[in-house]
Amino acid sequence: MAKEKFDRSKTHANIGTIGHVDHGKTTLTAAITTVLAKRSGKGVAMAYDAIDGAPEERERGITISTAHVEYETDNRHYAHVDCPGHADYVKNMITGAAQMDGGILVVSAADGPMPQTREHILLSRQVGVPYLVVFLNKCDMVDDEELLELVEMEVRDLLSEYDFPGDDVPVIRGSALKALEGDAEWEEKIIELMAAVDDYIPTPERDTEKPFMMPVEDVFSITGRGTVATGRVERGQLNVGDEVEIIGLEEEAKKTTVTGVEMFRKLLDYAEAGDNIGALLRGVSREEVQRGQVLAKPGTITPHTNFKAEVYVLSKEEGGRHTPFFSNYRPQFYFRTTDVTGIIQLPDGVEMVMPGDNVEMTVELIAPIAIEEGTKFSIREGGRTVGAGVVASIQK
């Protein structure tokens, strides 16, 4: 069987289903693949069991079960993630194992918003899922129109509470199970949902279009030529002759010009996101640039020491701590390529954090690092990972 060619002409977006346990996330995922495959003849219908039996993956030492499915509408190609358990969602969103350009929030019309509905909305806000579309599921079980309107209002209020535009978010009423069973009236609702996703979730800006940034992994001198910083370009493009800033670990950023770009010992005119390169830096001594700093387009990223973060603390079984920790705990924070010591403050009313918990915390690093909202990090202690986090907001 020849492999199908990936169609690049369509724009691509990463999305996922979120919401309370048993509200129908996986059934909806199966229904989307089934209805779209049936209507367009493209893509593969996935059964509930195939999605639900997702294999475990390890992301930064953390065990996560995630199902990845793909499907396409007339306008777009989608990669869709669905997680079986609540803990898997928390881990997935915090580690960025599956970056989402948007999410489908599934709420059972029969039950209304539940604790995990709230928690997933909060997580989406914290980790930077920019857009949510709501699927009000199990509407076939609710005869009362007023009740549906009440649930919809509740969901909209909840979204607004976490700074999503609750009044504008599309809410589609449907039944994933009925659609999956082939009921034409409910199949239409799946088509309606995907039209809303196509329309409401903007085409994501690809990494190559963003401002240039490369974490420095290694530095060496070439006699007679200068200093070379190596690393993998995280985003954007770098052209020979571009001015860049060296940021992090020092109070002051230093400006320099890139006089050469090499990949696999060959000279390039430019490098882009995903390339492993060496950048030759004009007028910079080997001592002035080090692992843990980043090269970036001037003015696009600044070094910070204080931030709020959403963190998942590894369980004992995942190789994490065996005991809780408290405020003023001082582990290492591993950003991109380096460790920096940081001091943790827990929120008011949170006495301690147990292994396996997720928590919002404030961190103060002892040296400034190039960070922004959405930057991922690991928390380490004696060389082993004890937590994973994402910067939710910069304080200083």
Swiss-Prot record:
Its EC number is 3.6.5.3. Keywords: Cytoplasm, Elongation factor, GTP-binding, Hydrolase, Magnesium, Metal-binding, Nucleotide-binding, Protein biosynthesis. InterPro entries: EF-Tu_GTP-bd (IPR041709), EF-Tu_GTPase (IPR050055), EFTu-like_2 (IPR004161), EFTU_2 (IPR033720), G_TR_CS (IPR031157), P-loop_NTPase (IPR027417), Small_GTP-bd (IPR005225), T_Tr_GTP-bd_dom (IPR000795). It catalyses: GTP + H2O = GDP + phosphate + H(+). GO terms for cellular component: cytosol. Residues 82-85 are annotated as: G3. Residues 137-140 are annotated as: G4. It is found in: Cytoplasm. GO terms for molecular function: GTP binding; GTPase activity; translation elongation factor activity. Mg(2+) binds at T26. It is an enzyme of class 3 (hydrolase). Residues 10-205 form the tr-type G domain. It comes from the Bacteria. Transmembrane segments: none annotated. Disulfide bonds: none annotated. Residues 19-26 are annotated as: G1. GTP binds at residues 19-26, 82-86, 137-140. Residues 175-177 are annotated as: G5. Residues 61-65 are annotated as: G2. Monomer. Belongs to the TRAFAC class translation factor GTPase superfamily. Classic translation factor GTPase family. EF-Tu/EF-1A subfamily. NCBIfam families: EF-Tu, PRK00049.1, PRK12735.1, PRK12736.1, small_GTP. This is Elongation factor Tu. It comes from Halalkalibacterium halodurans (strain ATCC BAA-125 / DSM 18197 / FERM 7344 / JCM 9153 / C-125).
